[in-house]
């Protein structure tokens, strides 16, 4: 359990435990708001042979209602947890892990931000989120036995908007800022997302393909289970909303995929969008200085609900706020946090409009709204346009300050209040090379070398990342190796590539492992000898694959974040002990070591950390490496010359990943493990 959460408030537990009726306290004081007006809905939900819902409604709002119903049928558990976090009650279900989210929600004041900005959304968007909330309420009222948290429903359109407000900053590293500050430490200079598991996205134009077809590969890496796992859907409305793709629990529309005209994929980017300020406080820490004024430090009492055994314990905390944003007080002082998109509710508006964009110009106009503060977009369309957009809401920062460090909070010179225009974002559009790609890397590597952007073109105050993953190294190497047109088969071979580039950080780590002094360690010397035979692929063919994957996975997070690498000898020893202890040998076939497991499915799966066929995993009780992230929902979208869009997809498990009794709990796992596709009826 993260220390920052424990340090934050477990000292309050003793007092909280004295409260009577702890087992029912949370439900008794829960006071959900009144529901939005209930309206009749005209919607049908049909499911294809794989259980994927195809939702048709008279209006867009009717479709959103159907999305809620269908998603709840497949995964009410995660929907309930997401909604509980929005209401500040996740801790009542999930204990400490949930209470971390609750504290963050209070600190960022997500619900109040949604309330203040709700009227700024268009009537159509408000109708959409309210219809989605109505669908969740109707499902919950008919399936009360599934509810673990009493008093959560009804939810409202404002709750749906608040969910976007809460989750958005965590996609660009808010957890890596909050954690250290709550522990009394300073955040790392390069915050960014904590997770090394990334995403891939790439597109090939009709001019470069061998059959005049524009192709897009959607390959976002998300956890295979939980509140940000992909769920596939297809939607159609009589108002012209036609889209196939996937979303997260709590989203009233697909977040990526394609319509008839265009599509996009997303990957996480790691630019610097969060600033931390050291406040100048008065003696009792009730005021802070800004320029020549002493201003009151706003304070608000909140109660966290923390499940502990059969009880839900009330834990009081105080959250603080300055003009900069949320404030954390610790033994080092007061630290304010300001992030891109602070106070913004328009993410839902922009995603909804993107779903219905009809051409490249309209899509770009919608992107220029800048309501989605971060995430790369890789784009393709029926007209043959492709592009890589390093989408970010860059603060308009003053020169002369160390924006990666802790900033002085006593001067308005560091308190930015506006953003650079979207046109300032790094982007590569319709390159002559006919391909674009992103794999959580610097935007200066996105296509052929002679058409890539130059780092010098972007001011240091923007905080654009400079790191290149193994996956992007492989994209560049594989595309460079194609002379002439790119066929569909070549594109899929690139997608499922399982190799490591010696020029990548993973390659440099393996080089360090191979130079460990093993003169007095015969077991490690044997392991090194095996690794020297490795062919640098995790395809399950050679005898060294399992050892290589174990060694590379041991530093996956450090490699992804660009952190200093640890000494190699202990990591090599740990990998050797793992394989010897589990199998009694080092040359274990990768298919025996690395598995996909879900219900009765227990299958070999190939690839590794930071390969284009990405498999991230945890060590299971039986010593196997069991996948939990990486390649998951994957979609291939094609616009043939003069023809209608067509697509194929696959999910690591199936349409109903939390319904063990469903035939679609794990029916796609065999397809996924063997790198096969299913059609998407559209």
List each model region and its residues.
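C-terminal/peripheral segments of proteins
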Residues: 2-511, 520, 526, 532-682
């Amino acid at each position: 359990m993260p220390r920052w959460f424990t340090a934050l408030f477990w000292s309050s537990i003793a007092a909280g435990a004295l409260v009577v009726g702890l087992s029912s306290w949370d439900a008794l004081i829960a006071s959900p708001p009144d529901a939005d007006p209930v309206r009749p809905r005209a919607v049908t939900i049909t499911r294809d042979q794989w259980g994927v819902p195809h939702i048709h409604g008279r209006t867009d709002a009717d479709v959103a209602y159907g999305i809620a119903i269908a998603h709840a049928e497949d995964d009410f558990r995660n929907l309930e947890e997401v909604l509980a976090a929005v209401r500040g009650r996740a801790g009542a279900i999930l204990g400490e892990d949930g209470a971390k989210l609750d504290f963050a929600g209070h600190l960022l004041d997500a619900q109040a931000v949604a309330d203040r900005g709700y009227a700024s959304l268009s009537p159509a968007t408000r109708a959409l989120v309210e219809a989605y909330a109505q669908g969740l309420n109707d499902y919950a009222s008919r399936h009360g036995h599934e509810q673990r948290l009493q008093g959560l429903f009804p939810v409202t359109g404002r709750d749906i908007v608040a969910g976007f407000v809460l989750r958005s900053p965590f996609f660009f590293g808010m957890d890596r800022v909050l954690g250290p500050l709550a522990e009394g430490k300073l955040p790392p200079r390069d915050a960014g997302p904590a997770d090394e598991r990334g995403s891939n996205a790439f597109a090939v134009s009709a001019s470069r393909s061998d059959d005049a077809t524009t192709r897009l590969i959607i390959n976002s890496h998300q956890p295979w289970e939980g509140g940000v796992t992909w769920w596939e859907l297809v939607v159609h409305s009589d108002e012209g909303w036609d889209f196939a793709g996937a979303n997260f629990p709590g989203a009233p529309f697909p977040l990526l995929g394609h319509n008839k005209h265009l599509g996009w994929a997303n990957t996480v980017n790691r630019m610097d969008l969060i600033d931390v300020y050291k406040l100048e406080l008065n003696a009792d820490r009730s005021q802070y200085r800004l320029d020549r004024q002493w201003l009151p430090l706003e304070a608000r009492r909140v109660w966290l609900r923390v499940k502990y055994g059969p009880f839900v314990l009330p834990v009081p905390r105080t959250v603080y706020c300055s003009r900069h944003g949320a404030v954390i007080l610790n033994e080092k002082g007061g630290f304010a946090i300001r992030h891109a998109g602070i106070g913004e509710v328009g993410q839902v508006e922009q995603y909804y409009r993107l779903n219905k964009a009809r051409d490249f110009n309209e899509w770009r106009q919608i992107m220029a709204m800048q309501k989605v503060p971060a995430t790369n977009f890789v784009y393709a369309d029926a007209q043959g346009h492709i592009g890589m957009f390093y989408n970010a809401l860059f603060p308009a920062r003053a020169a002369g300050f160390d924006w990666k460090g802790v900033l002085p909070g006593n001067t308005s010179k560091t308190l930015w209040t506006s953003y650079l225009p979207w046109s300032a974002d790094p982007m590569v559009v319709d390159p002559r090379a006919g391909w674009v790609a992103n794999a959580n890397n610097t935007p200066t590597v996105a296509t052929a070398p002679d058409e890539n952007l130059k780092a010098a073109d972007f001011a240091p105050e923007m905080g654009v990342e400079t790191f290149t993953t193994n996956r992007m190294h492989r994209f560049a190497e594989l595309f460079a190796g194609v002379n002439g047109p790119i066929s569909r088969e070549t594109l899929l071979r690139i997608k499922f590539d399982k190799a490591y580039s010696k020029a990548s950080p993973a390659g440099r780590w393996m080089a360090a492992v191979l130079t460990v002094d093993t003169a007095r360690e015969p077991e490690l010397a044997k392991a090194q000898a095996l690794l020297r035979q490795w062919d640098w692929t995790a395809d399950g063919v050679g005898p060294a694959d399992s050892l290589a994957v174990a060694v590379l996975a041991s530093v996956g997070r450090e490699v992804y974040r660009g952190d200093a690498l640890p000494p190699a000898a202990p990591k090599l020893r740990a990998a050797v002990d793992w394989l010897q202890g589990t199998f009694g040998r080092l040359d274990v076939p990768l298919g025996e070591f690395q598995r996909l497991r879900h219900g009765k499915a227990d299958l070999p799966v190939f690839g590794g950390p930071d390969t284009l066929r990405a498999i991230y995993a945890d060590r299971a009780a039986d010593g196997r490496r069991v996948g939990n992230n990486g390649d998951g929902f994957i979609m291939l979208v094609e616009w043939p010359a003069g023809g209608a869009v067509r697509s194929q997809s696959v999910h690591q498990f199936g349409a109903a990943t939390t319904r063990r009794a469903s035939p679609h709990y794990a029916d796609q796992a065999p397809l996924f493990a063997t790198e096969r596709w299913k059609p998407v009826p559209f």
